[in-house]
């Protein structure tokens, strides 16, 4: 195992870790870099400090490896750490093969899957969150890493790390952590101590940065998705802060409604994890855990912390109480809502939190307890987690064979041809496989030409395709019978073909042998032998048409193969007219301006003049 030395006890960590007698030698504490303990009053560690600490850990312990995941919007490097035993980390390539094989179950039977599950280890993603003003998340991850690495010889910790590889992200919004920490520390002790950051902590999107799971517009979202598809965790846990007052932490089960395409066994795992975390909190004497309620539902698949459910991963978030930043606050009973001032235990709120002080360190400790409970759960049930990943994917494949829609057909000829490409590229980047017809083919009684795209639903991530391509039917939930409807927590509908103006046909009859013979898979099947790489940063746009900037979706072969039909110039004349209804036209207009063209507008079209014939053809291609 890792080095060890008898040392003084620090903060006692939670769940299965008992009162300890030793710390492993050479494992530095966060204070050695931060100058203060994580969660200290009036103190926030920046992202740069956090990464400096994780690098120090990686240099000191054989139980941690640090990986680059990609670059942020502002150019910072995103990192995640793998924490486990040295023996497990030495076999990480083999375990990654197992995770990939179970995630993509084609040709794998139950017997072989059970053998792989028994051989493998659970892979658990935990991160410090992405809402940067919810400051406890990225303060708890360094402490979690330290408490695991410095106690690796303790039986409880060893039992966890023997069976789990922890994928720990210090934060998934590095830019935001840096901005918010610097802003708060600049204002501590002034009248502006609690003032809000006067700019978006995630460029362009702000607080909605966790609503990018299927559109993948943010470079950070693509870096995370790219990493997930290379490693395929069985659990994804994202920390948030804003639990319903006066509770101290909200945990799954979710409130109603939940996603109709969520695989049942995965939904059950999420519920079990929520209860395991609550149990761990009560065992530690940390009251105030609650579940369900009317706030946090799981209807919307845009959450980066819930969308993985539709790829057969137990994904969820929690909401830990927050006052403001690292400033402590003392609550009185008069601040509590009148209906909970009696502190009466409830079915899903069995240990009411009494009023008193609430500090950043309290939130950090609650988060660490919940994280450790998640790791402990994964260690105890690792065979089940691995096997259920296989079973859920297998069942999705079977569902696509026996229940419509059996596929989605996307013609190349569209009102905006590039919009169809953009929709499909996002699905493919997220692991949904897309095929293309090689010739004229009849499907569901209609003949489709070569080049038509097909998304079959007999594939393991088909639930994600159905979630975003079908029309949502929000349930009729009332506050009481005959009363007003309950307000949706977030989006009630998001049908991408309607939002993006793309013609998508749901196929109601099974794909024939002839139809399948005419389909060519775009990109290879996942290959676990391919070594993981960071999401590529590029200043040049990979796609010559209107798409996300930089490397975009081209780092995934299946997505890169989805391209619009070549454009062409028809007719003759001095003015090139482009359709104002097509997004790609505006890219062409900007390129034309750079060529020195004049731009006019008439009858719903833009006219680009003073261009040579060669320049016109270049813009249309």
What are the language-model segments listed below?
Residues 177-202, 206-209, 222, 226:
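Active-site-proximal cap/loop segments of hydrolase catalytic domains
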Residues 21-165, 205, 211, 217-219, ...:
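Intrinsic-disorder/low-complexity accessory segments
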Residues 1-4:
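Positively charged n-region of N-terminal signal peptides that target proteins for export
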Residues 130-132, 170-176, 213-215, 243:
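Acidic, glycine-rich active-site loops and adjacent beta-strand->loop/helix elements
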Residues 228-242:
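Proline-aspartate-enriched helix->loop->beta-strand connector
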Residues 6-16:
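Bacterial N-terminal signal peptides
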Residues 127-128, 169-171, 236-239:
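Active-site neighborhood of phospho(di)ester-bond hydrolases with catalytic His/Asp-centered motifs
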Residues 145-149, 163-185:
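Carboxylate/His-rich catalytic cores and anion/metal-binding grooves
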């Amino acid at each position: 195992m890792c080095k060890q030395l008898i040392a003084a006890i620090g903060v006692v960590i939670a769940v299965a870790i008992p009162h300890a007698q030793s710390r492993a030698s050479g494992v530095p504490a966060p204070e050695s870099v931060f100058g203060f303990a994580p969660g200290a009053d009036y103190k926030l560690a920046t992202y740069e400090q956090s990464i400096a600490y994780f690098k120090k850990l990686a240099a000191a312990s054989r139980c941690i490896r640090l990986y680059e995941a990609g670059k942020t919007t502002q150019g910072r490097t995103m990192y995640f750490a793998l924490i486990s035993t040295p023996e497990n980390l030495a076999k990480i390539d083999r375990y990654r093969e197992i995770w990939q094989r179970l995630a993509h179950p084609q040709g794998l039977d139950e017997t072989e899957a059970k053998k792989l599950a028994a051989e493998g280890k659970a892979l658990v993603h935990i991160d410090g969150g992405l809402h940067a003003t919810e400051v406890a998340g990225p303060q708890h991850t360094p402490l979690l890493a330290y408490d695991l690495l410095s106690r690796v010889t303790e039986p409880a910790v060893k039992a966890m790390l023997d069976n789990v590889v922890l994928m720990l992200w210090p934060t998934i919004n590095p830019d935001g952590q840096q901005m918010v920490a610097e802003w708060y520390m600049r204002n501590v002790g002034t009248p502006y101590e609690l003032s809000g950051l006067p700019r978006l902590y995630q460029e362009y999107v702000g607080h909605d940065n966790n609503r990018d799971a299927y559109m993948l517009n943010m470079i950070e979202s693509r870096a995370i998705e790219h990493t997930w598809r290379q490693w395929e965790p069985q659990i994804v846990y994202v920390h948030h802060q804003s639990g319903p007052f006066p509770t101290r932490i909200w945990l799954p089960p979710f409130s109603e409604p939940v996603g109709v395409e969520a695989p049942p066994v995965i939904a059950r795992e999420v519920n079990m994890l929520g209860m395991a975390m609550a149990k761990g909190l009560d065992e530690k004497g940390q009251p105030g855990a609650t579940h369900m309620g009317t706030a946090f539902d799981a209807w919307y698949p845009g959450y980066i912390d819930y969308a993985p459910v539709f790829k057969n991963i137990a994904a969820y978030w929690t909401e830990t109480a927050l006052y403001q930043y690292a400033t402590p606050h003392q609550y009185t009973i008069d601040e509590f809502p009148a209906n909970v001032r009696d502190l009466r235990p409830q079915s899903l709120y069995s240990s009411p939190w009494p009023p008193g002080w609430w500090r950043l360190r309290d939130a950090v400790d609650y988060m660490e307890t919940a994280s450790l409970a998640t790791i402990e759960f994964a260690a105890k049930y690792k065979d089940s987690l691995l096997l259920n990943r296989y079973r859920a994917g297998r069942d999705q494949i079977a569902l696509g064979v026996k229940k419509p829609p059996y596929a989605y057909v996307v013609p190349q000829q569209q009102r905006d041809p590039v919009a169809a490409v953009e929709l499909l590229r996002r699905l493919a980047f997220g692991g949904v496989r897309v095929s293309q017809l090689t010739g004229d083919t009849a499907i569901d009684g209609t003949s489709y030409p070569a080049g038509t795209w097909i998304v079959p639903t007999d594939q393991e991530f088909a639930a994600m395709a159905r979630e975003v391509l079908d029309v949502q039917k929000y349930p009729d939930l009332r506050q009481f019978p005959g009363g007003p409807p309950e307000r949706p927590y977030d989006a009630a509908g998001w049908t991408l073909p309607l939002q993006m103006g793309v013609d998508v046909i749901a196929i109601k009859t099974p794909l024939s042998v002839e139809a399948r013979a005419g389909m060519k898979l775009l990109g290879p099947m996942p290959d676990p032998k391919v070594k993981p790489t960071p999401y590529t940063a590029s200043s040049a746009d990979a796609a010559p048409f209107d798409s996300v900037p930089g490397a975009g979706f081209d780092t995934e072969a299946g997505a890169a193969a989805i391209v619009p039909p070549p454009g062409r110039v028809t007719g003759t004349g001095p003015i090139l007219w482009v359709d104002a209804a097509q997004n790609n036209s505006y890219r062409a207009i900007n390129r034309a301006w750079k060529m020195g063209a004049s731009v006019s507008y008439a009858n719903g079209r833009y006219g680009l003049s003073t261009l040579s014939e060669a320049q016109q053809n270049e813009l249309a291609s």
